[in-house]
Curated annotation (Swiss-Prot):
It comes from Amoebophilus asiaticus (strain 5a2). The keyword Hydrolase applies. The gene is folD. Catalyzes the oxidation of 5,10-methylenetetrahydrofolate to 5,10-methenyltetrahydrofolate and then the hydrolysis of 5,10-methenyltetrahydrofolate to 10-formyltetrahydrofolate. It comes from the Bacteria. This is Bifunctional protein FolD. Gene3D superfamilies: Leucine Dehydrogenase, chain A, domain 1, NAD(P)-binding Rossmann-like Domain. GO terms for molecular function: methenyltetrahydrofolate cyclohydrolase activity; methylenetetrahydrofolate dehydrogenase (NADP+) activity. Homodimer. Belongs to the tetrahydrofolate dehydrogenase/cyclohydrolase family. GO terms for biological process: L-histidine biosynthetic process; methionine biosynthetic process; purine nucleotide biosynthetic process; tetrahydrofolate interconversion. Its EC number is 1.5.1.5, 3.5.4.9.
Length: 298
């Protein structure tokens, strides 16, 4: 049976450390990290994600400002809101819960955030610094994955890391991070996507397999080798009348069968999700203490 990479437990340890750092800041009379979260519309999944982020902030002692706009909000209104949040010196981090309604240009909205407050790490300024291996905000989910690999001391140097999914929030940035000259990193990376032919030929070569496509049960036991470390980023709501909430969460990996063969695996839920939030909090603390671009306060 595979080693379970318990993101929920590791995230708990990270939040404890963050809470201690916040207490130290308070004792020294320094600003407490303050995160602004903007939600547009009434998507149930987005509401759940935002609730979990606000709850985590409260647990570690961060201040939060939650702003919800109607799904028909004008793009110009959203841009003005971000402008005001940028100008507010008491706010250290800003996140826009994705996805946004189709009439709003998500890229334009993200680019409007001041890079030092872009704690989701999606601004092109931060993305470019990440690509150059310079200090910056790293996108939350890839950072969470790196922290998880580091906690479990998963060897990455010289390993073949196969990433399925080339999205801008997970697959694309993680491909850069896993090939950088650092730990975790120094891996040989293969990035697969919807046009990749004979996917199994690649997954069977993977020492580290990261799946982030949102297709439940895509990866089965016959697609991996026994020594593989599997990171399942996918999370899909499957209708289930036996559950009180009416659905269950399923990842991109057929967990039960793959876990009997692989070396290590993240569960869904309880794997990458909690680590993403822990990484977001980490970025926010760094923003509050001016450590984003390697300029810590004295």
């Amino acid at each position: 049976m595979a080693v379970i990479l318990d993101g929920k437990q590791v995230a708990h340890f990270l939040r404890q450390s963050l809470a201690e750092q916040v207490q130290t800041l308070a004792k020294e009379g320094k600003p407490i990290p303050h995160l602004a979260i903007v939600l547009v519309g009434d998507d149930p999944a987005s509401h759940t994600y935002v609730y979990n982020k606000v709850k985590a902030c409260q647990e570690v002692g961060f201040q939060t400002t939650f702003i919800q706009e109607a799904s028909h909000v004008q793009e110009s209104t959203l841009l003005y809101l971000i402008h005001k949040l940028n100008e507010d010196t008491s706010i250290h981090g800003i996140i826009i819960q994705l996805p946004l309604p189709k009439h709003i240009n998500a890229i334009k909205i993200i680019q409007a955030i001041t890079p030092s407050k872009d704690v989701d790490g999606l601004h092109t300024f931060n993305y470019g610094r990440m690509a150059c291996n310079l200090p910056t905000h790293i996108p939350a989910t890839p950072l969470g994955i790196l922290l998880l690999l580091e906690h479990y001391q998963i060897e990455t140097a010289g390993k073949h890391c196969v990433i399925i999914g080339r999205g801008p929030t997970v697959g694309a940035p993680l491909s850069i991070l896993m090939s950088r000259n650092a730990y975790p990193g120094n891996a040989t990376v293969t990035l697969c996507h919807s046009y990749t032919q004979q996917l199994t030929n690649f997954t069977r070569q993977a020492d580290i397999l990261v799946v982030a496509v949102g297709k439940p049960g895509l990866i089965t036991a016959d697609m991996i080798k026994p020594s593989t470390t599997v990171i399942d980023v996918g999370i899909t709501r499957i209708p289930d009348t036996t559950k009180k909430r009416g659905y269950r969460l399923k990842g991109d990996v057929a967990f039960e069968e793959v876990a009997t063969l692989c070396n290590a695996i993240t569960p869904v839920p309880g794997g990458v999700g909690p680590m993403t939030i822990a990484a977001l909090l980490t970025n926010t603390l760094r923003a509050a203490t001016n450590q984003v671009y390697n300029t810590p306060t004295s």
